């Protein structure tokens, strides 16, 4: 392992995804961030939630560890009957976006399980809806754009 310390630690690393088929090699988000900070000398490392099926929809993680919706994208959480869940109730993540115009990708029901924690009250200070991704539906097909195996 080679440690590369950047001369200027004001950079920000944004990372996301890539563990679907390589789940046995997966490390926690916290461990990954700490390793990047240690090896590169960066102070800010943020995860994001997004998918190739809805290009342009990127939900950035705040410093409190939550993903935030933007002006251009939103999420809904649905139960097993596809009814809307209440805040702080886990269910399937449905992503909504204004960005896709060349294909019908404005609304995608994912196989990811998530929970909306609140709206306009995240401790990071950012307004809007914020949420967590808890995992995937059991027995869902493990695939994704980042799979290389």
PLM regions and their residue ranges:
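Active-site glycine/GP-rich loop and adjacent strand/helix microenvironment
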Residues: 1-149
């Amino acid at each position: 392992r080679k440690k590369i310390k950047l001369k200027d630690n004001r950079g920000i690393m944004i990372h996301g995804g890539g563990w679907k088929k390589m789940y046995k090699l997966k490390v926690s988000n916290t461990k990954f961030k700490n390793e990047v900070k240690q090896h590169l000398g960066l102070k800010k490392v943020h995860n994001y939630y997004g998918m190739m099926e809805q290009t342009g929809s990127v939900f950035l993680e705040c410093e409190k560890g939550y993903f935030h919706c933007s002006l251009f994208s939103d999420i809904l959480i649905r139960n097993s009957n596809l009814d809307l869940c209440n805040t702080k109730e886990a269910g399937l993540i449905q992503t909504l976006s204004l960005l896709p115009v060349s294909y019908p990708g404005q609304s995608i029901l994912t196989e990811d399980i998530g929970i909306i924690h609140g709206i306009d009250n995240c401790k990071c200070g950012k307004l809007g809806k914020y949420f967590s991704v808890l995992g995937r539906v059991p027995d869902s097909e493990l695939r994704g754009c980042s799979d290389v195996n």
